[in-house]
Amino acid sequence: MVIKFGYKASAEQFGPRELVELGVLAEAHGMDSATVSDHFQPWRHEGGHAPFSLAWMTAVGERTSRLQLGTSVMTPTFRYNPAVVAQAFATMGCLYPGRIMLGVGTGEALNEIATGFAGEWPEFKERFARLREAVALMRELWLGDRVDFEGNYYKTVGASIYDVPEGGIPVYIAAGGPVVARYAGRSGDGFICTSGKGMELYTEKLMPAVAEGAEKADRDVAEIDKMIEIKISYDTDPELALENTRFWAPLSLTPEQKHSIDDPIEMERAADALPIEQVAKRWIVASDPDEAVAQIRPYLDAGLNHLVFHAPGHDQKRFLELFQRDLAPRLRGLA
């Protein structure tokens, strides 16, 4: 299994210029990929940011030469028209051949209600149906042909994308449960999940579901890039490693809260009520490199080959330096 390392560019935490510089630093520190969150609103009102993901990708693309760039993740189904998303990614695919991927998910109310979604926030069944339809439409458009598409949610009439990269754009499907993970196995070029939810989720549900989906579609599961965002707060100062997780307290809210709360002020209020011990449970918090690697290893053993590291602290350059010095050599040794 070939191990790849990625950097999570946290658009909820850093402004546009700083976030671009961090992407450039990620390549300089040996990362193979950099993925960016796509939020219209951040998890936090105070101190939060939300630069536009696609502007970030093009800016970093111009200043790097080998880094794979993508979203983790974008929802191409509500505030975006999937045909326009397909056009945007096709353009980036032409500008940075072989380096662009589109990571997609079913969406959160936080980003869609503020931009005018009307009515009740849809249940998972509809959000998932929209996602499948959007992916199907985008892939048709990436063939470069004229597309007449009549779906339940989206429609095109004689639509063409005139500049498309050879082979289209790889689509990575984000999943937190087996239903979407099976879809990733059937249809995804890649699969995305996040760490810190109990190893049985990955070993007994997600990875078997990806394999099941691939088998039903007569695909080789080994050809699917299996990406996981590793939530890690590593610092040689143990107190700093723990305290750095505090900004990301919203990640420790329940799935229902994260998918239904549509106001960053309310999200921040709910998150700040959590004790630091509960916040830190979502993270690998370590000051010893061997301890950190020991906690990362089970994800590799589960078959996840593309590790994207999300560090919570404000000094991201420090994390990249420590990762390159302390963690990367040990992790590559596991391969």
Curated annotation (Swiss-Prot):
Subunit structure: Homodimer.
Keywords: Carbohydrate metabolism, Oxidoreductase, Plasmid
Name assigned to this protein: F420-dependent glucose-6-phosphate dehydrogenase 1
Organism, scientific name: Rhodococcus jostii (strain RHA1)
Name of the coding gene: fgd1
Positions bound to coenzyme F420-(gamma-Glu)n: 38, 75, 106-107, 111, 176-177, 179-180
CDD domains: Tetrahydromethanopterin_reductase
Catalytic activity: oxidized coenzyme F420-(gamma-L-Glu)(n) + D-glucose 6-phosphate + H(+) = 6-phospho-D-glucono-1,5-lactone + reduced coenzyme F420-(gamma-L-Glu)(n)
EC number of this enzyme: 1.1.98.2
